Amino acid sequence: MEKNCYELQYPRDNLYLSCYVNESLNYRYHWHPAEYEFQIVLCGKQEFCRGKENFVMEEDDIVLVEPNAGHASFSTTLNTRTLVIRFSALAFKPFLKKGESFSFSGFPSGQKTRKGPRYTRIRFYAARLLDAASQASPYAPLAARGSAQLLLDP
């Protein structure tokens, strides 16, 4: 599978993003020191490990991984694809007191929650972000930034 990775930078807001569609294959444990990561299962099924948690993710499920949290996944069905969006933790710095960190709650989604309004909204803005990032239009960076900011609204 060809992987197009889109990198977006908004230095005035300390917002640095990357997004791509990934084929979930093998178990590769890793972490990101200064980035959050959303993973949205587009199709298929995968097992996901985040820290000491293990869970199964199905189509439309979303997980968020905080900075420095070890994580890995592997496909349990053929052709499992995920949308991965990583964004800088520094984007929240203006909103936090010294020594605080930003924390999202309610992740991962699951069978009872994946179709709820919060997760539907996240999938919508994530799709808009990927679409805008892939466009050559001079206005695409503006659309991508707006989608990213709405995506990050906890």
Where on the chain are the PLM-derived regions?
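Generic protein-terminus/edge-of-domain signal
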Residues: 1-58, 101-103
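A hydrophobic/aromatic-rich effector-binding and dimerization subdomain
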Residues: 2-17, 70-135, 153-154
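Amphipathic, well-ordered alpha-helical segments in soluble domains
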Residues: 37-40, 121-128, 147
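Conserved GNAT-family N-acetyltransferase fold
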Residues: 39, 63, 83
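Conserved metal-binding segment of the jelly-roll/cupin
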Residues: 57-70
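All-alpha amphipathic helical-bundle segments outside canonical DNA-binding/catalytic cores
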Residues: 133-150
